[in-house]
From Swiss-Prot:
Name of the protein: tRNA sulfurtransferase
GO MF term set: ATP binding; CCA tRNA nucleotidyltransferase activity; tRNA binding; tRNA-uracil-4 sulfurtransferase activity
Key words, A-Z: ATP-binding, Cytoplasm, Disulfide bond, Nucleotide-binding, Redox-active center, RNA-binding, Thiamine biosynthesis, Transferase, tRNA-binding
Pathway recorded for this protein: Cofactor biosynthesis; thiamine diphosphate biosynthesis
Role, per record: Catalyzes the ATP-dependent transfer of a sulfur to tRNA to produce 4-thiouridine in position 8 of tRNAs, which functions as a near-UV photosensor. Also catalyzes the transfer of sulfur to the sulfur carrier protein ThiS, forming ThiS-thiocarboxylate. This is a step in the synthesis of thiazole, in the thiamine biosynthesis pathway. The sulfur is donated as persulfide by IscS.
Disulphide-bridged cysteine pairs: 344-456
Residues binding ATP, per UniProt: 183-184, 265, 287, 296
Species in which this protein is naturally found: Shigella boydii serotype 18 (strain CDC 3083-94 / BS512)
Annotated family: Belongs to the ThiI family.
Record localization: Cytoplasm
GO cellular component: cytosol
Domain THUMP: 61-165
Residue ranges occupied by any Rhodanese domain in the UniProt entry: 404-482
Amino acid sequence: MKFIIKLFPEITIKSQSVRLRFIKILTGNIRNVLKHYDETLAVVRHWDNIEVRAKDENQRLAIRDALTRIPGIHHILEVEDVPFTDMHDIFEKALVQYRDQLEGKTFCVRVKRRGKHDFSSIDVERYVGGGLNQHIESARVKLTNPEVTVHLEVEDDRLLLIKGRYEGIGGFPIGTQEDVLSLISGGFDSGVSSYMLMRRGCRVHYCFFNLGGAAHEIGVRQVAHYLWNRFGSSHRVRFVAINFEPVVGEILEKIDDGQMGVILKRMMVRAASKVAERYGVQALVTGEALGQVSSQTLTNLRLIDNVSDTLILRPLISYDKEHIINLARQIGTEDFARTMPEYCGVISKSPTVKAVKSKIEAEEEKFDFSILDKVVEEANNVDIREIAQQTEQEVVEVETVNGFGPNDVILDIRSIDEQEDKPLKVEGIDVVSLPFYKLSTKFGDLDQNRTWLLWCERGVMSRLQALYLREQGFNNVKVYRL
């Protein structure tokens, strides 16, 4: 099988040296992602496209799906590459490929040609289109807005029959811009802002301020791992977790109620800036949107920025909540966000929307900054690829099984879309569907006299959720592996 990768248009207008660098980086990113599916595949770069050739037909859908999620790719063409002799040979091959698709449909033929030939692209379009129209009685030519467009590419003595076109996410290849550190909470905003910087070519590391215990961190780890695995797995990134409960406790004890929200955000920026400096990261990323909450007014955002020289990027600054939620739905983080607890908003009953710098600084003089230094020093830094392994160690008490007993039920915790695409059927045992994002509220409604074997495709989510359910007091859970 063969795929032709078309570049994001902004790449093609770069200078020659920059364009070559971007294409080289994108080629490496594609190799890094696809090697997990087929180690023998070939990735070949050209001036205006990249070819991917693979032998394992069983991995075709997985490879195609992975390509649509790699930043820097505008669209993917799945093609059949065959030799041809003349225009009539091109027509005959197109007829075999497209006959079924054109039955009862309007169509047109579009051809791109490279190389030396005794015919033009328009000649091929007319010849092939006329032939298809004659040989498929129910088909009809329509040059404007046809139901089916027959795409052909002719290059020297090779014909590319385009079997399908699939849109990519666009943007720049990861690694073409510098690293950033995303302040991730697991909610709608931080997930979308992280994705937007990945799509713009940045390697995104994650910094999480834990305000709600182990269950909260597990949830945010899931979001970060999902984003990395889906859009950024071509690169290694860090997940830094900072226990911010001592900082919140100090704020609650010593800071005036109205100033708490702004001061908490200032403390987070101070801490994140220290982490960024430690690892040589150029900028922070937040999901703040202008006026969304009290700490996100222009006055308050300026006061928050003033505590650090580190650049703070806010890709969602002009977005409304509905737009952000729609983006979260598109990238697959909506379900995570809907079940993620929100802690920041509860610490202040009457937050100021227009903080005064002198008052903020006066309140911060009461704060013991050694607490902030300590939590940053003790921050837990892991390679995001190790989250799955670390979770295995953390859930040692949760048994992993590949068999089942008479009282067992498999609980498929994948998202509904994944379950519909690849239904799970295991002979000899019932399979019940309960997506991971409903476990926290719906697991207790299940028959607690049964043993529930949590299953997901890679085993990461099932182990994380098993740990969460154990913490909630459910001991009738195991992790199931096929």
